[in-house]
Regions:
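Alpha-helical transmembrane segments of multi-pass membrane proteins
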Residues: 1-17, 245-250
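Alpha-helical transmembrane segments
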Residues: 1-11, 58-69
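Membrane-interface helix caps and helix-loop-helix hairpins in membrane proteins
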Residues: 17-22, 73-85, 102-108, 128-138, ...
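Loop-to-helix transition at the N-terminal end of transmembrane alpha-helices
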Residues: 19-37
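Membrane-embedded alpha-helical segments of integral membrane proteins
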Residues: 134-217
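Internal/C-terminal transmembrane anchor helices
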Residues: 219-253
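A cross-kingdom signal targeting lumenal/periplasmic-facing segments of multi-pass membrane
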Residues: 298-455
Length: 456
């Protein structure tokens, strides 16, 4: 079962590891498969009972079809929110449940509920990022959350031991990780691997090697004795399903390199800095900035601004590529925009729906966003325009994403089957955004006065 899941997850894991090496803040995903195997190894016994191979196949088929279909439909209906949650990663969880049911029986799959709950919570990075942001967003905070996840895995992996020993192993894992987390968090990936991977594994091994005074449960038997006989055809079907998932490429990875621009592009574009938002450091790290620049006014056109998120790590910027930083009455999604002479490659459009506004005091908006590199910084530039044609309402300011409100609210919105609407945007609004984007892009592409600009 573990081999089947690893093959299905191999392509995604390769991209996750590459992102972690590049500086991604979701580096804990590198050790998550190890923690999952550690927990699964703790299920060495299963309860007595009569198995039914045909029922196992039926249940596995229903879970697989319904689970994968639900993931596919949610990704199609709300692509941006699904991409932020990396909802496609849950496909491996669904497949793992199906494999366990077919290979070991439905009864054993039910006893592994704690493993499924663990993976459902941490296979997607949003809960981890939200917890890290709540603590402050520093590398130490991220390492603390990762070490806590590893400690939870230790507790779940020692289920057959006495509660006192389980708690002791969990405490030892946390205590052993603490000095490393506090002193070595600047080496983020190695710290995560050791604190959330190596130390939990050693803690479980140590707990199991210690003599156990707990008596065996007479209602349980070794899993090898309870494992039903499966034919070569069964293994072949599972292998085919695994190959299909592996070929599907669960991880969406954009390898396009951002264009390089002069570091003084804001000054040369006539943009004036008017505000900065410190909350971004909780999500993108202490070296990141989010700055709003005022755009030159144009008579008869809506108000506009330029927001620039800067960070030294391209991987961190990729972690947040699907975050919506502006308020909206309904779920909104990024859409690709065809590159042209005035629109940078990779530009995406995002806007609120004025027809679906739930708060009359709110300001609807239209935004074009793209990624670029200025010197040693990677930047996400967003040209945001107010949909108020009078020009007296500034576009809304960026807000910290609320994972619970945005996600639960979006799922509730979807359950109510609200119509998507026509997504009408006044031509003046889109024209204002396109014109400002073209002006900024043209200045960025031109050489600096006195010589060509540096390209790192």
């Amino acid at each position: 079962m573990a081999l089947l899941c690893m093959v299905a997850y191999a392509s995604s894991y390769a991209h996750i590891f590459a992102d972690a090496v590049a500086g991604s803040r979701t580096a804990y995903l590198v050790v998550l498969p190890v923690l999952a195997l550690l927990i699964a190894a703790g299920y060495r016994t299963t309860s007595h009972g009569v198995g039914d191979g045909e029922s196992d196949w039926i249940v596995a088929a229903l879970i697989g079809i319904l689970g994968l279909a639900a993931i596919y439909l949610l990704i199609g209906r709300m692509p941006t929110l699904s991409a932020w949650w990396r909802l496609e990663s849950l496909a491996v969880l669904v497949w793992a449940v199906c494999c366990v049911i077919i290979l070991f029986g439905m009864r054993h799959a039910l006893t592994m509920w704690s493993l499924w709950l663990f993976l459902a919570c941490f296979a997607t990075p949003v809960p981890y990022l939200a917890a890290t942001a709540a603590l402050g967003g520093t590398p130490i905070d991220g390492a603390i959350v990762a070490a806590a996840i590893g400690a939870v895995a230790v507790f779940l992996a020692t289920r057959t031991l006495a509660m006192r020993r389980r708690l002791a192993a969990t405490a030892i894992s946390l205590a052993a990780s603490a000095p490393l987390v506090v002193n070595c968090a600047s080496w983020f990936l190695p710290t995560i691997i050791v604190a959330a991977g190596v130390i939990p594994v050693l803690s479980v091994i140590g707990a199991r090697l210690t003599p156990n005074s707990r008596s065996a449960d007479p209602t349980e038997r070794p899993i090898s004795a309870a494992m039903p006989h499966r034919s070569v055809r069964t293994v072949g079907v599972l292998a085919v399903g695994t190959a299909i998932l592996a070929a599907a490429g669960l991880h969406q990875h954009d390898a396009a390199a951002p264009r390089t621009i002069p570091t003084d592009w804001t000054a040369r574009s006539g943009l004036s800095r008017i505000a900065s938002y410190d909350f971004v450091t909780k999500f993108a790290g202490p070296d990141s900035t989010l700055v709003r620049f005022a755009a030159p006014d144009q008579k008869g056109m809506p108000a506009a601004a330029v927001d620039v998120l800067s960070t030294p790590s391209e991987a961190v910027l990729a972690d947040l590529s699907d975050v919506v930083w502006y308020p909206a009455a309904r779920p909104v999604s990024y859409r690709a925009v065809a590159a042209s002479a005035g629109i940078p490659a990779g530009t995406r459009v995002l806007h609120s729906d004025a027809d679906a506004a739930a708060d009359a005091r709110g300001v609807d908006w239209y935004a074009l966003t793209w990624t670029q590199r200025a010197g040693s910084l990677f930047q996400r530039v967003t040209v945001i325009v107010s949909q108020s044609l009078s020009g007296d309402q500034a576009p809304p300011t960026p807000q910290p994403p609320d994972a619970l409100d945005a996600s639960v609210g979006s799922w509730l919105w979807l359950s109510r089957q609200r119509p998507q609407g026509l997504d009408h945007v006044d031509p003046l609004v889109s024209q204002r955004a396109a014109t400002l984007t073209a002006a900024v892009s043209a200045v960025s592409d031109s050489p600096s006065p006195g010589g060509s600009h540096r390209r790192d």
